Amino acid sequence: MNFLRQFGFRFTTGHGIWAATLIPACIAICMHFDLLWLGITLGALIALFSVLTIRGLRITGWVRAIFSWRRRHRSTPDIASEPAVGSTVMPGDHVAVRWQGDYLIAVIELVPRPFTPTVIVNGSAMTDDVVNTKLVERLLEAHCPDLEADVVSAGYRVGKTAPASLIALYEQVVGPYPAPANRRTWIVLRADPEKTQRSAHRRDSGVSGLARYLVASATRIADQLASNGVDARCCRSFDDYEKATEISYERETWSSIKGRSTFTAAYTAPGGPDMWWSARADHTITRVRVRPGAAPSSAILLTTLANPTTPRGFSCLFGGQRAALQGIVPVSDKHYDLPIGSAGVLVGETADRYPVYMPFDNVDVSINLGDARLFTQFVIRSAAAGAVVTLGPQFREFATMINGRVGRTPRIGWPNATTYLGPHQGVGRVILRPNFIDTPRHRQLPIQLINPREESRYQMALEQ
């Protein structure tokens, strides 16, 4: 069944005209040599190959992809221009724009709601902190139909700061499910100077008008997303976006991108975010391109330390690896509800034994842990999820086991927040007990603990 999904049909006027011209010519030439059967066969093949696609490309497309890849595979991609801020009057003067190839772009960050749990039900991640790509398309149609948008998510399933044995243990506990320890999401608005010429000219001439139009559109889209329950903020810097989506690049091969010490491969997969974030990788980037009036397309970039192998259900974008970095994908997809923030740390399971995750990486908080077992579980799972753990001097040996630090203030440092392992002024409080978790957003959310036997040795080290 997966094999048949690689094939499709697409009719375009240009290919139809060529087929209508070549088929009679082939038949006429072959009739002249009394080879009518050959003419009919060639005509049938021309008709078939003018509409048949293999992984989104016709035969002519694959030939073009091969020559394009041979021309560019040893050259590095063009570097984006320096960002410019202050292209229009308030409220859009804090929106950065810059050139990326032939497009002027602006970025909107989607801010996750704090303490939004993720429950894994039969392999699917259930969370209410999502953005629907159909909503993004409707907003583009209503406010800026000549722009296109990329919904970009970047993150990782497990961290890299903990020892390899602890990371392997946490991966075993988490299983092959879509529960990334870290994930951030942006909407990248892209303006083509040719398509937006009329809209941009209403504001000013040249590049200035284009920048003003893009900034005003970004501000309007962010406001409308907020009205629909999605916390969206225009970015005045590309730093966070670049850091999260940066890929090491040395050269492009036919099926991957070779970096300094990593490999990145671009894929398509029809299963949506549940399938995309279940694939094992050191770093994951998903990009869904939305255009008004057209089917969306998606690309998944998986970065690994070893030579990549195609995950089950994925299709590698052969010859189009660099193009996929910019969201250029020949295969169409459908609209999805895309999770915005991290799934977070595994804190327990429901009464029906569905795993429950809670993010701690977007707001400062203090946590009250009921006993040594809860303390051990939360600390080692946070370390495996990529946090930097700081413990008191009395836990020096335990801190060494998880690559932690020793300091006066016990805490867990996330990329954008801190979780204090004790009372702390000025922040909210989370209470974790064997039968519930209490957060500033939830009042005693019922859970049950998950107690893998392999974690017991860490508790023994803590109690020594």
From Swiss-Prot:
Cellular location(s): Cell inner membrane
Membrane-topology descriptor: Multi-pass membrane protein
Transmembrane portions of the chain: 11-31, 34-54
Disulfide bonds: none
Keywords carried by this UniProt record: Cell inner membrane, Cell membrane, Membrane, Transmembrane, Transmembrane helix, Transport
Effect of disrupting the coding gene: Increases efficiency of DNA conjugation when disrupted in donor strain. Loss of secretion of EsxA and EsxB, but not their expression.
GO CC aspect terms: plasma membrane
Name of one Pfam family that matches: EccE
Keyword presence, DNA-binding: no
Keyword Transmembrane: yes
Coiled coil: none
Function statement: Part of the ESX-1 / type VII specialized secretion system (T7SS), which exports several proteins including EsxA and EsxB. Plays a role in DNA conjugation, in at least a donor strain.
Assigned protein family: Belongs to the EccE family.
Any further remark recorded for this protein: DNA conjugation in M.smegmatis is unidirectional with distinct donor and recipient strains; mc(2)155 is a donor strain while MKD8 is a recipient strain. Mutations in a donor strain that alter DNA transfer do not always alter DNA transfer in a recipient strain.
Subunit structure: Part of the ESX-1 / type VII secretion system (T7SS), which is composed of cytosolic and membrane components. The ESX-1 membrane complex is composed of EccB1, EccCa1, EccCb1, EccD1 and EccE1.
Record protein name field: ESX-1 secretion system protein EccE1
Species this protein is from: Mycolicibacterium smegmatis (strain ATCC 700084 / mc(2)155) (Mycobacterium smegmatis)
Taxonomic lineage from the root: Bacteria, Bacillati, Actinomycetota, Actinomycetes, Mycobacteriales
